[in-house]
């Protein structure tokens, strides 16, 4: 980025922070948190959204965000190169989440959130940290709202990333194992003592 584009991006990020902080809709607050967590580190590509998905999400959740800010933020999104294994995991988890999407939620919003969650499972930390949320309870509330049937299946109260990896394994008909990002987590040995 040049100094000019850095400044434009920083202004756009400030506008997004303001829009998220002043959102009167819980979903806008959630998406504001998810997006600003990555935008603040210039990691919007890690959300796993295409530029069109990202632009649509901003338009739906933050309709008062200036178009110049949307363009500045969207211009930093590049396709994520994923290995075949990671790509298959993301696609399977995304489909599994969408199978359980709350019909009362806008389908495009559920689709964006499913992509964000699936891509967060590739990173090496607890899911709540990878999403930029403030704890497991925030992940539980998000999943209960957007994917209630899936959330209800976690009767053993597994850590969410581990549970989602098990959902992928069930979909693929393979033995359960860790999500791609799990081996880098500080608690990997706790979640997978035999791995």
Regions picked out by a protein language model, each given a short descriptive name:
Residues 2-164:
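Hydrophobic, aromatic-lined core segments that form the binding pocket/scaffold
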Residues 142-195:
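Cys/His-clustered metal-coordination modules, chiefly Zn-binding fingers
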């Amino acid at each position: 980025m040049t100094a000019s584009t850095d400044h434009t991006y920083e202004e756009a990020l400030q506008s997004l922070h303001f829009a998220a902080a002043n959102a009167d809709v819980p979903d806008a607050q959630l998406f504001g948190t998810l997006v600003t967590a990555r935008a603040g580190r210039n990691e919007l590509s890690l959300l796993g959204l295409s530029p069109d998905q990202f632009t649509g999400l901003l338009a739906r959740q933050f309709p008062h965000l200036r178009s110049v800010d949307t363009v500045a933020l969207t211009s930093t999104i590049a396709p994520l190169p994923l290995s075949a294994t990671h790509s298959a995991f993301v696609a399977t988890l995304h489909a599994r989440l969408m199978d359980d999407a709350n019909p009362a939620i806008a389908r495009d919003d559920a689709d964006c959130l499913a992509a964000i969650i699936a891509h967060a499972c590739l990173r090496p930390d607890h899911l709540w940290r990878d999403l930029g949320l403030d704890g497991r309870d925030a992940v539980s509330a998000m999943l209960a709202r957007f994917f209630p049937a899936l959330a209800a299946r976690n009767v053993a109260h597994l850590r969410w990333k581990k549970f989602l990896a098990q959902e992928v394994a069930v979909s693929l008909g393979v033995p359960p194992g860790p999500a791609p990002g799990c081996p880098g987590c500080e608690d990997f040995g706790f979640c997978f003592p035999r791995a």
